[in-house]
């Protein structure tokens, strides 16, 4: 069975890939609108942990709409959720060239955790994706809380941690920040996105 996992190069999506690896042929998917080097950063992380990666182009109009929504809201939650929803549907519906063969995925997955506020996937949304696209939706970390994830990261991954705007990652936030700065100015980015740290995976620990 072949699973496509939405991948940012961070600790959560990397742990999700490792958990799925015993049961699926896992391909990581960098979902991008192409306005930054996010896909390249995701590819570097994928290579560091030994998984293949493909890219999928998202509808840039969705990203622009998400940016406008975040500016109007004054916080990023709903905009990031909107892009994640679009990414899952795009991966579920798409065909991808993996190792020279064009394939669809039997399952799609992400690195959402039990305690996440955003992005999240409700039971109804998961069932809707499964019914409409004929795939399984998997959330390997959905039963893991923050401390459990931190313990697994400490035991398994080599990561870099730093302020979100300084870490080279392949996630939606980096591209949404860039679009927002272009359309609304750096002041809007500072107002919408709270200061927080993120991680970038650079390798696996020896076990």
Region locations from a protein language model:
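Nucleotide-activated chemistry modules centered on ATP-dependent adenylation/adenylyltransferase
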Residues: 1-24, 29-207
């Amino acid at each position: 069975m072949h699973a496509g996992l939405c991948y940012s190069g961070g600790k959560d999506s990397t742990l999700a890939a490792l958990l799925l690896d015993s049961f699926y042929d896992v391909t990581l998917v960098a979902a991008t609108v192409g306005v930054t080097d996010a896909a390249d950063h995701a590819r570097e992380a994928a290579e560091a942990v030994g998984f293949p990666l493909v890219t999928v182009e998202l509808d840039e109009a969705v990203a622009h709409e998400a940016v406008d929504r975040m500016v109007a809201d004054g916080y990023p939650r709903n905009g990031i959720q909107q892009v994640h929803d679009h990414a899952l549907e795009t991966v579920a519906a798409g065909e991808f060239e993996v190792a020279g063969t064009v394939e669809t995925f039997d399952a799609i997955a992400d690195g959402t955790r039990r305690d996440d506020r955003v992005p999240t996937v409700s039971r109804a949304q998961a069932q809707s994706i499964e019914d409409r696209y004929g795939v399984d939706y998997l959330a390997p970390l959905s039963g893991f809380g923050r401390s459990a994830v931190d313990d697994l990261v400490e035991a398994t991954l080599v990561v870099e941690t730093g302020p979100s705007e300084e870490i080279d990652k392949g996630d939606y936030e980096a591209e949404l920040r860039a679009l927002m700065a272009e359309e609304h100015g750096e002041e809007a980015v500072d107002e919408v996105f709270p200061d927080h740290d993120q991680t970038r995976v650079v390798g696996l620990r020896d076990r």
